[in-house]
Amino acid sequence: MRSSLKPVLSNLRFNSTIASESLRFHVSRTPSKNLPVYLDYKQRGTKILTLIRKIHGDSNALRLRLISTLKMSPKDVYVNKLTNQVVLKGNHIVTVREWLQDQGF
C-alpha cells in the first residue's frame, strides 16, 4: 500500500532566505548557491556592464533601491524588460553582491 507523503515545512531547504516581507522583489541563487551577478563586456571590451539575473517580482523596485543605496545615476542603471535583468554600467559586481548578501539573499 502506498502512503501519502506530505512535505513538512521544517524539512524543506531553500536556496536563499527571504529577506523581508516588505520587499517587492526576490533574487534567487544559482544551483551552486551563488548570487546571480555577472559581468558582461560589450564593444570589444571597452564597455563593462554588471548584470543581475534571476529576479522575481518587481525588478524596477530593485533598480530604484540600487540607485538610492549605491548612489548611482538613474541613467546608469536600467531594467532589460525582455530578459528581466537589472543592468548597471560599470564594474559593480563586488558591491552588488555584498549589498544583496546584506539584504538577506
Curated annotation (Swiss-Prot):
GO cellular component labels: mitochondrial large ribosomal subunit; mitochondrion
Pfam families: Img2
Ribonucleoprotein found in the keyword field: yes
Top-rank lineage group of the source organism: Eukaryota
GO MF terms held by the record: structural constituent of ribosome
Location of the transit peptide in the chain: 1-15
Principal subcellular localisation of the protein: mitochondrion
GO biological process: mitochondrial translation
InterPro entries: Ribosomal_mL49 (IPR007740)
Gene3D superfamilies linked to this entry: SUI1-like domain
Swiss-Prot/TrEMBL keywords: Mitochondrion, Ribonucleoprotein, Ribosomal protein, Transit peptide
Subcellular locations according to the entry: Mitochondrion
Subunit structure: Component of the mitochondrial large ribosomal subunit (mt-LSU). Mature yeast 74S mitochondrial ribosomes consist of a small (37S) and a large (54S) subunit. The 37S small subunit contains a 15S ribosomal RNA (15S mt-rRNA) and at least 32 different proteins. The 54S large subunit contains a 21S rRNA (21S mt-rRNA) and at least 45 different proteins.
Function (record text): Component of the mitochondrial ribosome (mitoribosome), a dedicated translation machinery responsible for the synthesis of mitochondrial genome-encoded proteins, including at least some of the essential transmembrane subunits of the mitochondrial respiratory chain. The mitoribosomes are attached to the mitochondrial inner membrane and translation products are cotranslationally integrated into the membrane.
Record-linked PANTHER family: LARGE RIBOSOMAL SUBUNIT PROTEIN ML49, MITOCHONDRIAL 39S RIBOSOMAL PROTEIN L49
The family this protein is said to belong to: Belongs to the mitochondrion-specific ribosomal protein mL49 family.
UniProt name for this protein: Large ribosomal subunit protein mL49
Originating species: Schizosaccharomyces pombe (strain 972 / ATCC 24843) (Fission yeast)
Lineage: Eukaryota, Fungi, Dikarya, Ascomycota, Taphrinomycotina
